[in-house]
Amino acid sequence: MKTKLLLCIALMLVLNSVSLAQQRSSITLQSANLKPIAGSRTLTIDNMFFETANGRVDIPVLNLDASVGSIDVTAGGHKITVSVKPQARDFNVTFKAQPDSDITKWGLAINSSPTEYYTGLMERVVDGPQAKSWATGIQEAMNLRGQKVDMIIKPTTSIYAPYYLSSRGYAVLVNGNWPGYFDFAVSDPGRVKIEFEGPSFDLKIYTASDPAALVRAHAIDAGPPFMPPKWMFTPWRWRDEHTQRPTYYDGTPVTGPFNSEIMEDVLMMKAFGIPNGIYWIDRPWGPGKPWGYDDFDIDEQRLPNFAEMVKWLDAKQTKTVLWIAPFFQGKMMKEALDKGYTLAGQVRPVSGNNYPMVDLTNPAATAYWQDGIAKLLKLGVAGFKLDRAEEDIPETGPYKVFDGRTIRENRNAYPPMYVKAVYEVAKKFRGNDFFLMPRAAYTGSSPYSVFWGGDIGGTQEGLRASIIAIQRSAVMGYPNWGSDICGYNQQLLEQEVCGRWLAFGALNPIMEVGPTRNVAFWNLPREPTYDSQLIAIWRLYARLHERLIDYNYQYAQEATKTGMPIVRPLFLVDPAAPPAWSNWWTYQYGRDLLVSPIWEKGKRTQEVYFPAGSSWRDAWNPKKIYRGGQTFTVNADTYQLPLFIRVGAKVDLGDLNKEWKESVEIAGKKPDLKALDAELKRWWDTRRAGGGGQ
C-alpha cells in the first residue's frame, strides 16, 4: 500500500542583512513513513549552499509551490534551479546552476534526532587509513553516528556507495561519481551534513517504515545485483603467489604435470574430504617482473601445462579464476602509451606500482585491453579477481580522460567502468557462466560482480571488521561478499582467529580460504606447522558451506529480483527491537538461519538476540530452542559457530557434532602425497599417450 506523502516547502529566513544571498531557507519533506520528532513526521533540509573559487554562497529558496516542485532564484551571480519531485513514497532533490562552469561544490544539511542511527556508505568500519578499522580496542561498529566520511574510494577495503539509511525511516542516495563528504552529527549534533563536488547536485531520498524496504529499493535502483552461477557458492581455495617447487610440503618429489602448489592443494583437499569448487590463482601467473602480468600471457615455467590444468580442474568440478588489474605491462604497455590509451595525470616514467592504467572512457583503449582478457577466457578461465582500480590512480590536476570528464570525477567512476569492461568480454565468451570479484566498488558496480573485502588485517579485530563489512555491504546493495579468511595484511595465522574466521566464512555467500603467506594449514610458519585443528575446522565448515549451495543460490536470486540481501543485519528483520540495532555481531542469513560469529580470542560464550516472530533451534543441540524477541547467552567452543535454524524451516545442516568428530579423525592422518602424486602422474601419462581419462 502506497503511503500518502505531503510535500511542503517551508520558508525559514534568517535575515543577516538585506542581501538576498545571505538569507537562509529550508525544504521540509513530510511523510507518514518518518518517525516523529516533536510530534512531526518531517525531514528538514537546510544550510543549502554552493561554492566557487570565490567562496561559499548560501541558497535562498522562496515561494516554491509544491504543485510545481521547482523554483529559480539568483545567488552569487548564478541562476539556481532547486527542484523537489515526489516519486511514490520517495523524493528527488536537485540543484542546478547557470552558469555552472565555476561551481566546485554543493552542500546541505538534514536534521538529526539525538538517538538516530545511520549506516551504509563504506565497508570499512571507520574512515581514514584502513588499519584504523581493525585497530586494537576499536569500539565503532555498524552505526556511523559520530563519524565523518570522505566519499572517495580508498584502498584497499574499498567497497563504497554514497548511500546511507537512517533509523528514522529514510535513506539518502547521492547520484553521480564526484567525491563528497558526510558528517553524521559531528560538527553539528542536530544535523547530518552532506557536501559533494561537481557542477550540480542530485539526491534521491527514500522513505519507508521498514528499513528492509529502504535497502531493497536502493539495491534495485543501483543494480539490480549480479546473479552469479551456482558454482560460485562452492568453497574456494587460493594462495597469494604460486611457485613451482621440486617437492611437496613434506619433501615428497613432484612428478605430476602441473604447478606443484596447485597439485598439492587439490590432492590434499581431496584426501581430507574438503570440497573445493573454485581455485583462484593470484599474481604472478604471467611473465615479467615483479608482477608476472605481461601481455596476458601465461608463464609456463610457473604454471606448466596451464590449459590442460584448467581442463583437469574442470573435470574435478573446480573452476579456475585468475587475478587481473586495470593496467598494462609488457609489450602492451609500450603500445598503449604510444597510442594514448592510458589515464592522463599518472606519473611518468613508471615507478613503484604506478603502472599505466587503461582509460576506460576510450572505446579503442578498452577494446585493446579487453583483447588480453579474451586470451585468458579462451584458455578456459571462468572468472577473475579484479584487483586495484582505486590505488595509485590520479585524482588531482588539470587533466581530463578521453570522454572529457576531469580525473577528479573519474576517480569514483573508474571501478564500475573496470568491472563493466571485464563483464562485457566475459559475457561474450561464457554467457552467464562466470563471475567477477573486484575489491573496489561504487554505485554502478553491483550489476556486474560479486565482491571481496580487500586486504583486511589478519587479527581478531580484522575478523571483527569483516563481520561489520559484510553487513554494511549488504545494506549498500552488494549482497554477495566474502573475506580473505585468516586475513591478508598483518597476518599472524593464530589458530583461534583462523578457526573463528573459517566458521564465519562458511556463513558468507563467498567462502575463500587462503591463508595468504603462500602456505596451507599443513605447512604453517609457526607451531604446529601441521595444524590438524585448523584442518578439521576447515573441513567441517567447507562441508557446511557446500550443503548451503542451493540455499545461497536461492537468496542470490531473491537479491537480484527484489534487492533483499541474504545477509540481514537484525534491524532489517526486527526493527522495532532495540537489541536489533545494537547486537551488531549477529545477523540473519536468509530467512531461516541466524548466525552470531565470535571474533574475540578466549571467548567461549556469546550474547545473541533472537529476532521476534520465530523460535530458533540450536544447530549444535537440536533439542535446545530459543524463543524470539529475547537475548540469550549461548556457549561456543573454539570450533563452534553460534548457528540457529528457524523452527519449521526445511534446512538440513547435517549432524555438526558427528561431522566435527569425523573431521578431527581425518585431519589427524597426514595424506600420502607420494601415492596421490603417482596417481596423477599415471593419469597424465595415459592422457599423453592418447588414452584419455580424467
Give the location of each predicted region.
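Sec/Tat signal peptide C-region and signal peptidase I cleavage site
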Residues: S17-A21
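Catalytic and substrate-binding regions of extracellular carbohydrate-active enzymes
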Residues: S40-V68, E665-L676, R682-W684
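Catalytic-domain carbohydrate-binding cleft regions of carbohydrate-active enzymes
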Residues: Q23-T42, T74-G76, Q87-D90, Q98-V647, ...
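Bacterial N-terminal signal peptides that target proteins for export
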Residues: M1-L7
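Extended, loop-rich substrate-binding clefts of extracytoplasmic carbohydrate-active enzymes
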Residues: T52-Q98
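Bacterial N-terminal signal peptides
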Residues: C8-N16
